[in-house]
Amino acid sequence: MTLIKILCCIAILCFSFVPFFNATVEAKAINSHTYNDYFKKVTWIKRSGVWSLSVEPKATLTKNYGNANVQGAHTSRSYKLLENKHKKDKYWKNSESMANQYLCHVQFAGSMKSPWNLEPSRKKYSYSYTLKKKCNP
């Protein structure tokens, strides 16, 4: 009887930590994602005389992971990869504004709108103002 109680306690403890271990494993795996895991196509386009980084996201980026930490890690990782690849492009500037626009698109446009157009000519505003202006302040 004591052995059964011990085994039950062990089973309960193991199942209690499954979400923790799954999130930890997934978070570690996020760092192995590459630029191509997140983006179908990224190109500079000119619209109405304004340069824009046109971003077509893949499902890896727009998927709802059901865990804010995992979602945030994907957003952060993907933006770092995007910035590292394009920050030396002649049209890239205003990184903070680009980051706000990107975050807004990831969080609110997701897969409902593609491409996402990040415009480096836009000034940096607060994130709440960026949201109010539908990601392009």
Which role does the model predict for each range below?
Residues I30-K41, I45, K80-K87, N94, ...:
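Cell wall/extracellular polymer interaction/catalysis modules
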Residues K85-P137:
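Extracytosolic low-complexity repeat regions of secreted or lipid-anchored proteins
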Residues A23-Y65:
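N-terminal export/targeting and maturation segments
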Residues L3, C9, R77-S78, S114:
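Terminal low-complexity, poorly structured segments
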Residues L53-K90:
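Acidic/histidine-rich, surface-exposed loop or edge segments in extracytoplasmic proteins
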Residues I6, A27-A29, Y102:
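Intrinsic disorder/low-complexity segments enriched in polar/small residues
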Residues M1-T24:
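Sec-dependent N-terminal signal peptides of Gram-positive bacterial secreted proteins and lipoproteins
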Residues P19, I45-R47, E96, G110:
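A generic structural signal for short, solvent-exposed coil/turn residues
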